[in-house]
Regions:
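Short secondary-structure boundary motifs at beta->alpha junctions and helix caps
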Residues: 52-59, 128-169
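Soluble periplasmic/extracytoplasmic beta-strand elements of cell-envelope proteins
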Residues: 26-31, 44, 97-102, 117-123, ...
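A structural "domain/chain start" motif
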Residues: 1-65, 174-200
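Solvent-exposed amphipathic alpha-helical surface segments
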Residues: 79, 83, 167-170, 174, ...
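Surface-exposed short loop/turn segments
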Residues: 1-12, 79-129, 145, 197-199
Length: 200
């Protein structure tokens, strides 16, 4: 999942079932953003709640936000609840978008063993209207196997894995809600269409 140079390396139905006869939407994964201080390859840690520091000799192979996008694409695509799940640069027409932001990714040394906290904010957007279909913040803390950057990398991978699992459920729930509203809107238009046809 993620690597460092030090280690080359609304609440909805929890089990959504979609009508396979209906058209599935296409989802575009927008490039994840990162909160101030976290949009960097430098690995952050803290020894007290009021001070953030960076490891001097350890860093991610790329920014966490950049490494996260392909993981989001593959994890959500595996749900089977979308016609396609594509990165931002795709030219294919899409109905929905996923916007995300890394709020926090840090190794915490205020207790033993140290812990890695990963917090991600995600929103599903209706591309036609620009409205937010669903929004949620995910956060996981995972204990490090060792109190060093390598232990932090392993813990970060586990935290990312947990959040991806929860995010796939969230995206499926949001899609189910969106599709229900689309069907409802289509049904609401039918009487007016029928009346117009009869009048003509």
């Amino acid at each position: 999942m993620v690597e460092s140079k030090a280690q080359a390396a609304p609440v909805l139905n929890a089990n959504p079932v979609l009508n396979t006869n209906a058209r599935l939407p296409t989802l575009v994964i927008q490039p994840p953003k990162a909160a101030a201080g976290f949009d960097t390859r430098r690995m952050m840690y803290t020894r007290n709640p009021h001070q953030l520091e960076y490891f001097a000799k350890n860093e991610w192979v790329d920014t966490p936000a950049h490494m996260l996008q392909p993981l989001l694409v593959s994890a959500i695509a595996e749900t089977g609840h979308f016609n396609a799940v594509l990165p931002k640069y795709s030219l294919v027409k899409s109905e929905l978008s996923l916007e995300s932001e890394i709020v926090r990714l840090i190794q915490i040394f205020t207790s033993k063993p140290s812990q890695v906290q990963f917090t991600l904010r995600a929103s599903i957007i209706d591309n036609a209207t620009g409205k937010v279909v669903a929004q949620r913040e995910f956060s996981e803390k995972v204990a490090s196997a060792s109190d060093d950057p390598i232990g932090g990398v392993v813990a970060a991978n586990l935290a990312v894995k947990k959040i991806l699992k929860n995010l796939t459920t969230f995206s499926s729930q949001a899609t189910l809600s969106w599709r229900a509203s689309e069907v409802g809107a289509a049904i609401a238009k039918q009487p007016a269409i029928q009346a117009l046809t009869q009048h003509n």
